[in-house]
Amino acid sequence: MMVFAFWKVFLILNCLAGQVNMVQVTIPDTFVNVTVGSNVTLLCLYTTTVTSLEKLSIQWSFFHNKEMEPISIYYSEGGQASAIGQFKDRIIGATNPGNASITILHMQPADSGIYICDVNNPPDFFGKNQGILDVTVLVKPSKPFCSIQGRPEAGHPISLSCLSAFGTPSPVYYWYKIEGNTIVPVKESFNSATGVLDIGNLTNFEKGYYQCTAINSLGNSSCEIDLTSSDPEVGIIIGALVGALTGAAIIICVVYFARNKVKSKQKNLNSSTELEPMTKVHHSRQNEAIPAGGIQLEGTLPSSIHASHNTEPTTAVLEPEYEPNPPLETATQPDPEPEGSGPMPVPETEIQLQPEMELEPETEPEPEPEPEPQPELESELEPDPQSGVIVEPMREEEKETVKA
């Protein structure tokens, strides 16, 4: 208290002596409202006891309502001025003495907040050198968004909501019902600050079109919503339609995959069929010397032997080692004749030969005395390993003749 009293006395004495230097800042309008997109001039006037303005400095600071620390947006000293931050190229400062006002161009909602004007002119260190302004950017309500809470079916409780994303000052909401060409206020209670309309259990009386209007000092905006109680039969029809479409889609998919599978199998079958003729040709060339039905070779004994024995030409039958399919009937061997009756003529057997294959004639052997006939003994000729055939048994007399 003693210090404060001392300074008070000191200032009074200096004023009486005419030696006190002071700066006085005046703010004509501390509350300013401006429409979004328009320009605004923030007035700040000052007085100083120092005649020289060479050291005069003017600074404007701003902080948004949500921020705690002010930021410098404009500074001028010795006639040199500059704008800073989000207001760069948007601020024009006054140049006439005693006027520290600024004009801000194209105001936006984010420009709403507190502005501080600070003036200093050394050696003026006393007085009120600071002024504060509260600026609000007015915004027309944006088009509200209307929505339904609950199931819009008869007997179910529902409510309607309406909300604008932007609007300064905060808009007030009103609900109306559209009946034909007229709009009438709703009878149900609603909250004008939040825009919620509580309808309760929906009946046929409440169904129809509703309109919500958001209003503030700059204008209004509206939205509409169609509130119609749905018929249960409509839900059944929609469900049946969805089920039918789903079933049809499943059937189409099954048919599509089945057809693709059949086409794939047919393609593989065609590929194997194209390779089959080459395989058959290869087998037929290997079997040209050995027909599938069996091979029979015809060999004729020399004519001198036939003449000496007075016999018919003898035929030797060769058959394959394996049993052909279908089996071929072999020539039936005749019953042996009793001794002394002479050699039995061998019946001629037809032998199938390919035209290209012929037996080379053997060298004619010298005739030998005719042996006495003996009982027939069955024997097998050794198969030719190269031809893969079996020689049919011959009579003993024929063997002796061939060996000779």
From Swiss-Prot:
Composition skew (Basic and acidic residues), residue ranges: 393-404
Polar residues biased stretches: 301-314
Stretches for region Disordered: 266-285, 298-404
GO biological process per UniProt: epithelial cell morphogenesis; maintenance of gastrointestinal epithelium
Disulfide bonds: C44-C117, C162-C212
Intracellular or extracellular location(s): Membrane
SMART domains tied to this protein: IG (SM00409), IGc2 (SM00408)
Pfam family, one: V-set
Record's bilayer topology term: Single-pass type I membrane protein
Signal peptide: 1-22
List of residues that carry Phosphoserine: S271, S272
Residue ranges annotated as Cytoplasmic topological domain: 255-404
Taxonomic superkingdom: Eukaryota
Alphabetically ordered keywords of this record: Disulfide bond, Glycoprotein, Immunoglobulin domain, Membrane, Phosphoprotein, Repeat, Signal, Transmembrane, Transmembrane helix
Bias (Acidic residues) ranges: 357-383
Chain positions carrying an annotated carbohydrate: N39, N201, N220
Domain Ig-like C2-type: start-end pairs: 141-228
Extracellular side: 23-233
Domain spans labelled Ig-like V-type: 23-133
Transmembrane segments: 234-254
A cellular component annotation (GO) from this entry: plasma membrane
Name of the protein in its database record: V-set and immunoglobulin domain-containing protein 1
Source organism per UniProt: Rattus norvegicus
Lineage, opening ranks: Eukaryota, Metazoa, Chordata, Craniata, Vertebrata
